[in-house]
C-alpha cells in the first residue's frame, strides 16, 4: 500500500498551516514518518491518504502495518505470452518479485493453455500472474504490473478502447480479481528486452520445459543460496 501525508502545523502568532505531499510512501515509511513528526510540539494534525482516497490516522496505520507485515509487499509482476498458431498452444510466463519480513523473494513459473491468439495469451499470462499473487497471500496493497504488450496494458488502463469480446472477457476477469484482492495496480509498458525473464518462461513451455521456482534473494537481488 502507498500513502502520502496531509499535515497541519500550528505555530504561535501564525495560526495553522496545512501541507500536502505528492510523494508516495510505503506503509512502513509512513509509520516512521508519523512517529518522527509526532515528537514536534507544533504538529497539530496528521493523516495519510491512500491510493484510493481513503484516510488513515497514525493509530490505524500502526494496526495496518502490523497486519501487512505478514503479507507480501512491494510487489512487481512481469508477464508475457507466447502462441503457436498450428497447435493453438499458448505459453504463459510469470515472474513476481516481492518483499516479506524484510526479505526479497522471486517467484518464476510458466503454464500452458489452449487459446486462439497471441493477445489472448498475454491476457491469460497476466490473469494467471495475479492468481499467483493471490496464492502468496497479498491483499490491500499496491502492485506494479510490467509487460511489453501494448494491447493488454493500454486497454487495462483505459488508454485504448476494447472492441474484441474475448479481450473484454479477460479485462473483466483481471479487474474483478484485482478488486476482490483490494490490490491497487500500476501498469508499466516496458521494452521486450526488459521482459526477457517472463518471455523466456513463456517460450520454454512451448518446448515442454516446465519451470516453477520460489527463491529468496540477497541484498543485490541475486539468488540467496548460502
UniProtKB/Swiss-Prot annotation:
**InterPro entries assigned to the protein according to its UniProt record, in alphabetical order:** RNaseH-like_sf, RNaseH_domain, RNaseH_sf
Q: Which NCBIfam families match?
A: PRK07708.1
Q: Which molecular function GO terms apply here?
A: nucleic acid binding; RNA-DNA hybrid ribonuclease activity
Q: Give residue ranges for domain RNase H type-1.
A: 71-207
**Any Pfam family the entry gives:** RVT_3
Q: Which CDD domains match?
A: RNase_HI_like (cd09279)
This protein is called Uncharacterized protein YpeP
Q: Which organism is it from?
A: Bacillus subtilis (strain 168)
The record's listing under Gene3D superfamilies reads: Ribonuclease H-like superfamily/Ribonuclease H
